[in-house]
Each structure stands twice: as C-alpha cells, then as structure tokens.
From Swiss-Prot:
Native species: Bordetella bronchiseptica (strain ATCC BAA-588 / NCTC 13252 / RB50)
The protein, known as: UPF0758 protein BB3258
Transmembrane residue ranges: none
GO biological process, one term: proteolysis
Residue span, MPN domain: 103-225
Motif (JAMM motif): 174-187
Family indicated by similarity: Belongs to the UPF0758 family.
Pfam families in UniProt: RadC (PF04002), UPF0758_N (PF20582)
C-alpha cells in the first residue's frame, strides 16, 4: 500500500486559514485542524474525509457520540475527545440560536437541533423543548428513554415540567433508531394525547419532530397536529 502524498506547507489547512480565513477551507480540512495529525497511512485531511463518509456528512457527524468516535480505527481517545468537544460546541451553538430566535419561524433550525440531539441515539429518547411566550427556548429536557423500538412518555410529566418552567409552548422530538423518520399510529395517538393535556393548562404543542439518523420529519407539517 502506498503512503499518502505529503501536503506542501502552503497547502496546510492552518496556513490557508491564516492567509484566507476559515470559510475557504473544506469540511475535511476544518476537521483536520481539530484532529491535528493523521493516523498510519492517512493524513489529517484524509482522516477528515473518512469521518465524513463514515457518519454521513457533517449532519451525521454532529449527531455522533464520543463512544462512536472512539471506535474509528486509529482515531484514539485523545482525538475522539477533542472532536467530541468541537461537536458539542456546535450543538450548543444551535441551542443558543433557539434561545434567541422564534422557533416557529425557524423550523429548519429546530429540526437541525433535534437531529443533533437525537440522531446518534441507539435507543428511543424523547426530548421536550420548552418555549416562552415569544417562542424562544427556555430549556431542553429529556422526558423519556426507552428501548430500540419504544419510549414510554407520560403526559403528566411533560405538563408538570411545562408549569415548572412557565412555558407557553413546547416542541417534542423523539428518535427512531434504525428506523424511518415517519410517524407511527402510536406516535400520532400519543402526540394528540399530550396536546390535549397541555391545552388544559393553556400551553401550546407546536410540533413533534421525529428523527431517524440524519433524517427528520415534522408531524405538524404532515397535518398530525
């Protein structure tokens, strides 16, 4: 097996970033800066390419857990931890955006946040995004954790947390590990039950987002609310 060609210094991602700015670098090159070095037979840029291919691009990588990163051949604990920290900062950036922006006016931002939070989970999790009267994020909380195929959600717990956080509205999201981003009959029935429970305390259920890997679907957009 031939070794990868070494990069000329002028072509190093760090040198190009300093000269031309981070926006001029490709996704693998930006990852290379976080990784710092490659592994045997693979430079840092090639390792960045490999990670993006393995996890399905940036969106898939954003939903990757530290444990999943550690099993990548040659990546190692140190690189996995650095990369996990960078990805967590990216997730928190999405959360900051939700704190500052109207969630109803930014459905794509909501879907990206939910995918980042749930896309890598191996069992079903359900989260609730509690929103204020201006539909800005107050807090995101896990409301259920289950098995590969189901998570038991209790409407009373969601109602109690809505009251505790003085929420005016909320968005639910849960994942389908290994499945498709489509609402099941059980999903639809539970969502309507939760919506009715929240209506009793004058809290609006805006949406229920289903996540399956890098894919998301809005139950509101599909007419299920």
């Amino acid at each position: 097996m031939s070794l990868p060609e070494p990069l000329l210094r002028a072509d190093w991602p760090r040198e190009r970033l300093l000269r031309h700015g981070a926006a001029t670098l490709s996704d693998p090159e930006l990852l290379a800066l976080a990784l710092r070095t490659g592994v045997a037979g693979c430079n840092a840029v090639q390792l960045g390419h490999d990670l993006l291919r393995r996890f399905g691009g940036l969106r898939g990588l954003l939903g990757t857990s530290p444990a999943e990163l550690q099993v990548v051949p040659g990546l190692g604990t140190a690189k996995a931890c650095v990369l996990a920290a960078v990805l967590e900062l990216a997730r928190r950036t999405l959360e900051e955006d939700l704190v500052r922006q109207d969630a109803l006016a930014n459905p794509d931002l909501v879907r990206r946040y939910c995918q980042a939070a749930l896309g890598h989970r191996k069992v079903e999790h359900c989260i609730a995004l509690y929103l204020d009267a201006r539909l800005k994020l107050i807090i995101c909380a896990e409301v259920a954790r289950g098995t590969l195929t189901q998570a038991q959600i209790y409407p009373r717990e969601i109602v109690r947390e809505a009251l505790r956080h003085h929420a005016a509205a909320l968005i639910l999201a849960h994942n389908h590990p290994g499945g498709t981003a489509a609402a099941s009959a059980a999903d639809i029935a539970m969502t309507r039950q939760i919506r009715q429970a929240l209506a009793l305390i004058d809290v609006r259920l805006i949406d229920h987002v289903i996540v399956a890997g890098a894919a998301t679907v809005s139950m509101a957009a599909q007419g299920h609310l």
